[in-house]
Design a protein with these regions (language model features):
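Surface-exposed cap/linker segments adjacent to membranes
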Residues: 2-65
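The feature encodes a structural signal of leucine-rich repeats
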Residues: 92-100, 119-121, 140-145, 164-169, ...
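C-terminal capping segment of individual leucine-rich repeats
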Residues: 101, 125, 135, 149, ...
Length: 414
């Protein structure tokens, strides 16, 4: 009888495992996670936790946001918190350290809400995690260094929170990491050495400073790079070796010097360098890339609000959306640009606030309705009405630049 009483807790435990099918440890962790979070909405239709009934026979099949392994006791392998629906305000509360008890977890996702507090450092014990996505909430504190010890981590997205501190230098040691999205936080310091096989890096809209990592420390595999809206400075020559880039956004920083010719190629179809301190001419593309000037549909290049000089080359003719305004370009607009505008291949061409002297209009041929062309505040009278009908409000109301400014500028450049 005494032996039976001693074994009774174990019998009950095994019975619970068999009945519910899920690991008791995982079930307890899910209970703690639910207790630390709450649905913002009071409507059961949009509420996430409505299905989390802990008396249910099999939470693995009835709980929203979880998937489990097949074998009993079932273990939670993915956890998605929130519905992710556009009409759902999401969750509030904090992330419970109990998440770390889900030792078989491979994916952890938190959808948009107002979850606050730090990211639990204990997440670093979940060695099978490949995806961490905790976006669009109000998470605070620094990025736990323990995250960068996860040997299988492929994707890390902590964007649109209120994270502070620096990016841990140990990020460079995580060779499995391919996607890092930390944009729209309050992260400061310099960009550390990055994993050698990184494909996607978004650090936009933070408080980062310093220069980009040296040329031999940049991942040659990078295809997407965005560091816009920081306090970064220095030359762009470190990007010359990044031949796999298809998207580049360095806008709203303090980068200086000339633009490497290797960046002007058709495969880099989205390039945003606006609002920096860039100087010099737009170079011809490298001779080693014969198709470099063939930009196709969907291509965008924004070099506006810099100090670029000289006459326009044919390098960017054919770009679908092209912003060259607020620079110091001179001379006549090349005919290739004009042909591209009239054919509708270039749908947006902003050249306002330069020192351009001529735009060779095709007499009697109207612009396509889909084209937005702005030529105001240059050293010419824009063709009427082509040159200013599609100008943004920021272009101002002056049609041409004052003659004395044009004369003084041409004299200084001679």
């Amino acid at each position: 009888m005494r032996m039976f009483l001693l074994l009774l807790p174990l019998v009950l435990l095994l019975s619970a495992v068999e009945t519910q099918g899920i690991s008791v440890v995982d079930l307890s962790a899910l209970r703690e996670i639910k207790n630390s979070l709450t649905d913002i909405t009071s409507s059961s239709l949009n509420a996430f936790f409505t299905s989390w009934d802990f008396t249910a026979p099999d939470p693995c099949s009835s709980f929203a946001g979880i998937t489990c392994s097949l074998f009993i006791p079932k273990r939670v392998t993915t956890l998605t918190l929130g519905t992710g629906l556009s009409d759902s305000p999401g969750l509030a509360g904090i992330l419970s350290p109990a998440i770390s008890n889900l030792s078989e977890l491979t994916q952890l996702v938190l959808f948009t809400g107002i979850v606050t507090g730090p990211i639990p450092d204990q997440i670093g014990t979940l060695k099978k995690l490949s995806v961490i996505s905790l976006t669009n909430n109000r998470l605070t504190g620094s990025i736990p260094t323990s995250i960068f010890t996860l040997p299988n981590l492929h994707t890390l997205d902590l964007s649109h929170n209120q994270l502070t501190g620096t990016i841990p230098g140990s990020i460079s040691e995580l060779s499995s990491l391919k996607v890092v999205v930390l944009g729209s936080n309050k992260i400061s310091g310099e960009i550390p050495i990055l994993p050698t096989e990184l494909l996607h890096l978004d650090l936009s809209n933070n408080e980062l400073s310093g220069m980009l990592p040296r040329k031999n420390r940049m991942p040659l595999t990078l295809r997407y790079l965005s560091v816009s809206g920081n306090r970064l400075w220095g030359p762009l020559s470190v990007l010359e070796s990044l031949s796999e880039l298809v998207y580049l956004d360095l806008s709203m920083n303090r980068f200086s010097g000339t633009i490497p010719s290797s960046l002007f190629r058709s495969t880099l179809s989205s390039m945003y360098l606006q609002r920096n301190n860039l100087t010099g001419r737009v170079p011809q593309p490298p001779l080693t890339s014969p198709a470099a000037t063939v930009y196709g549909p969907g291509s965008t290049v924004d070099l506006s609000h810099n100090s670029l000089t000289g006459e326009l080359t044919n390098t960017l003719a054919g770009v679908e959306t092209l912003f060259l305004n607020n620079n110091r370009f001179t001379g006549a607009v090349p005919k290739d640009y004009v042909e591209s505008v009239y054919s509708g291949n270039t749908r947006t061409l902003y050249l306002q606030h330069n020192y351009i002297a001529e735009f060779p209009v095709k007499e009697g041929l109207p612009l396509p309705d889909s084209v937005a062309l702005c030529l105001t505040y240059n050293c010419m009278v824009p063709p009427v009405p082509l040159g200013f009908m599609a100008c943004p409000v920021s272009a101002g109301g002056q049609i041409s630049r004052p003659v004395n400014q044009c004369s003084a500028f041409n004299t200084s450049m001679a």
